[in-house]
Amino acid sequence: MDITGKTRVLGIIGWPVAHSLSPLMQNAALEAMGLDWIYVPFAVRPEDLASAVAGLRTLGVSGFNVTIPHKTAIIPLLDRITPEARLMGAVNTVKREGDDLVGYNTDGEGFIRSLAEDLGFVPAGRRILVLGAGGAARAAVASLARGGAATVMIANRSVARGEELVEAFQGVFGGTQFAAMPLDIPLINAEVQNFDLLVNTTSVGMGETAFEGLDISRMNPAASVYDMVYAPWETPLLAEASRGGRRCANGIGMLVAQGECALAIWTGMEPPPGIMRRRVLAALKR
């Protein structure tokens, strides 16, 4: 790739950001699309966020992704955000529109696309159990409700956090029944058979962590399991689900799909199908 004075710049800001797979998949797509654009990572400490955003604005960067821990903190630094981003309470994509920096959120759409592509799952009329109540859970819950889910149960160690999500969404999505419960394994084991999909939005599953005692065998054999964790590739949760023959998927599909959505926002063009996923899988040796 030749970088010239006309090359347009995209990027990702986060802390840390060296582990991000986004530069690999975005640059693969940009090259395949024949665009004179480049996508680079920017390591931005939390205390430097305001000055970093001001710098990106001044330098004329065309757009950038936003990852942990900046997805909420960046909102007051932008000129405006979309209704989707406001609903999610977070921004993961920023586009320069004239002199303005506009915040978007593609996490929800990426999640729904991944459910369809990786599990063949459509939320309309379905009952879903979501583990966790953080930012990833908020995106999942909102997108599931928008997709017509009948019931969304939020299980979190702090029930109050789960109840906050219930209160945030129950007046917005009248067709979905929301509820919160403790992330207590015996309680979940007693209820898990009532759901068509289980979604883990927590970091449990990374490293040596696991949901000790969670009995996936109680789920309906036709139910599906989605774990947003993708390192390791097969978490203990997914390993147990697959042993029972249930359809399961990790978060790689969501990572790729939200990136595809972001690139379409920046360029006005859809990336070639599969190019981002293939690049990510090659990097992970999958």
Curated annotation (Swiss-Prot):
Residues reported to bind NADP(+): G132, A133, G134, G135, A136, M228, G251
InterPro entries, per the entry: Aminoacid_DH-like_N_sf, NAD(P)-bd_dom_sf, SDH_C, Shikimate_DH, Shikimate_DH-bd_N, Shikimate_DH_fam, Shikm_DH/Glu-tRNA_Rdtase
Pathway: Metabolic intermediate biosynthesis; chorismate biosynthesis; chorismate from D-erythrose 4-phosphate and phosphoenolpyruvate: step 4/7
One protein family per Pfam: Shikimate_dh_N
Keyword Glycosyltransferase set for record: no
Binding site residues for shikimate: S20, L21, S22, T67, N92, D107, Y230
Enzyme class, UniProt record, top EC level: oxidoreductase
Superkingdom to which the source organism belongs: Bacteria
Keyword annotations of the record: Amino-acid biosynthesis, Aromatic amino acid biosynthesis, NADP, Oxidoreductase
Enzyme Commission code: 1.1.1.25
Function: Involved in the biosynthesis of the chorismate, which leads to the biosynthesis of aromatic amino acids. Catalyzes the reversible NADPH linked reduction of 3-dehydroshikimate (DHSA) to yield shikimate (SA).
Stored HAMAP family: Shikimate_DH_AroE
UniProt-listed PANTHER family: BIFUNCTIONAL 3-DEHYDROQUINATE DEHYDRATASE_SHIKIMATE DEHYDROGENASE, CHLOROPLASTIC, SHIKIMATE DEHYDROGENASE
Protein name: Shikimate dehydrogenase (NADP(+))
Source organism of the structure: Geobacter metallireducens (strain ATCC 53774 / DSM 7210 / GS-15)
